[in-house]
């Protein structure tokens, strides 16, 4: 007598509600992150717009983990990939509009594009964004800053959606900004922000942006596979910089597999071509160990690390 085949449990994507955006399985994240390493997303969701995102969040299985990513500029995805859902905001969240001295930006808008739009509109104060890789959503999440300014200095209000699909309007005080951090709950998703500029001649703004670009190219490995600043400065804007401590500990040029501490700026890790995420993370941890042994100061990761480590063969 023939035995009936045992029914297979539904895959994750089969358990998810219908969307107007795009749901995809087994999406390679190594093609997204600037390090060009890492395993796949089990399922990636690219919502069409805020309504699509909110509807999805209200209906999704609550036990399924959700991870939000941007353009992958300050991100290390581990080699075993990311289980559950990976949410990536796309074109529906990248619009930038100006009205008087205010700029409304979607969370997926590139920081550099926001700075460029402000310049064309004759607004100053946002030039620093031209030197920050990534999106406005990520900039708000970590209070990104460069060249003497931070996102908190120009934020009027932010829009976010909580895990239940409820929209919220948040003031800078609500976000409780600190050095490279915000008080935004980890499971809330930034969807847009209103930023403030000041009237200025576009040529003046252009000169400032050019100076920032030149300074960045002179001091950072901008043409390498890197994730930006690896560690936060231990005392914020005060005290020794992370790169100074790394240099003091003799880590400039240190290698682990295909990963290397940049010779140009030693708070940057580089994928020299064949690095794994494990190489990069292991090298970062070795840098932390050597800095602590040399200086007594503990460095904390600024690069966000997500996913699981690759399982070793048995």
PLM-predicted stretches and their roles:
Residues 4-136, 144-146:
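Anion-binding (especially nucleotide phosphate/pyrophosphate-binding) glycine-rich loop
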Residues 46-47, 76-79, 87-88, 141-143, ...:
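Short beta-strand-to-turn element immediately C-terminal to the catalytic PLP-Schiff-base lysine
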Residues 110, 141, 146-169, 177-181:
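Glycine-rich, mobile lid/loop segments that gate access to catalytic sites or pores
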Residues 97-100, 139-140, 188-192:
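Acidic/polar active-site rim loop that often engages polyanionic ligands
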Residues 44, 104, 157-159, 192-194:
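Beta-strand secondary-structure signal
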